[in-house]
From Swiss-Prot:
SUPFAM superfamilies: Glycoside hydrolase/deacetylase (SSF88713). It comes from Pectobacterium carotovorum subsp. carotovorum (strain PC1). This is 5-oxoprolinase subunit A. One of its GO terms (molecular function) is 5-oxoprolinase (ATP-hydrolyzing) activity. Keywords: ATP-binding, Hydrolase, Nucleotide-binding. It is an enzyme of class 3 (hydrolase). The keyword Hydrolase applies. Belongs to the LamB/PxpA family. GO terms for biological process: carbohydrate metabolic process. The keyword Transferase does not apply.
Length: 245
């Protein structure tokens, strides 16, 4: 059994380099919610040095709210914003001698694309135009995954170790109580359930079927490092190989 472990980096966190020793894929902020040309370049250099898969982490243009504010942006504008961000990171990766492997939207762009077909299509079309070899990472079972599949893109279905799920398979919004799992033990148990049994318990007690290609851990805070180490130990104990998807 193989699983990819990814983290969102280049967002101003202090633990980026240390996390790169534990994850197999890195999603690098492209400047719209966090980061700039220099942080993108540094993240790429670190990622190449540690041999992780390099991915773009594009967002709505929302630095004030860290990309976590819902926005009503026309599909054609989202398409242009995606091409802009992917183009910038692709150029930096090429300049450093690396290869961009995947794209994972950030924050509300990710969450809205999970439910909104037109937005999902705009993102998938931008990825295909920039580089049809790029893999599109999205919430397991989401509209974004379906949009990528319709266009013939390789997709990677993502699950979250420390987030709670609604009965429809989407994430409990961060604005609601109970959105996050604060117990490492519960987060580890949920992760194993998703990988080994392809299901997750929703907040109403029902089971939701999920495909787990890659697991996200959040890179902010010292706790992220401790949890990443626990996750790697848990995978080793259960004979789960960690490798880039």
């Amino acid at each position: 059994m193989i699983i990819d472990l990814n983290a969102d980096l280049g967002e101003g966190g202090e633990n980026d380099e240390a996390l790169l020793k534990l994850v197999t894929s890195a999603n690098i902020a492209c400047g719209f919610h966090a980061g700039d040309a220099q942080t993108m370049r540094q993240s790429v250099r670190w990622g190449i040095g540690y041999g992780v898969a390099l991915g773009a982490h594009p967002s709505f243009p929302d630095r004030e709210n860290f990309g976590r504010k819902a926005m009503n942006v026309p599909a054609e504008i989202v398409f242009a914003q995606m091409v802009y961000q992917l183009g910038a990171l692709s150029a930096i990766v090429a300049a450093e001698g690396g290869t961009l492997s995947h794209v994972k939207p950030h924050g509300m762009l990710y969450n809205q694309a999970a439910c909104e077909p037109a937005l999902a299509d705009a993102i998938a079309k931008a990825v295909k135009v920039v580089n049809p070899a790029l893999r599109l990472v999205g919430l397991a079972g989401s509209e974004l995954i379906r949009a990528g599949q319709r266009l013939g893109l390789e997709t990677r279905q993502e699950v979250f170790a420390d987030r709670c799920y609604l009965p429809d398979g989407t994430l409990v919004p961060r604005t609601q109580a109970g959105a996050l799992i604060n117990s490492d033990e519960l987060a580890l148990a949920q992760t194993l359930e998703m990988i080994q049994r392809q299901r997750v318990r929703a907040i109403d007690g029902s089971w939701v079927t999920v495909q787990a290609d890659t697991v996200c851990i959040h890179g902010d805070g010292q706790h992220a490092l401790l949890f990443a180490r626990k996750l790697r130990s848990c995978f080793s104990e259960h004979q789960i190989t960690v490798a880039a998807a």
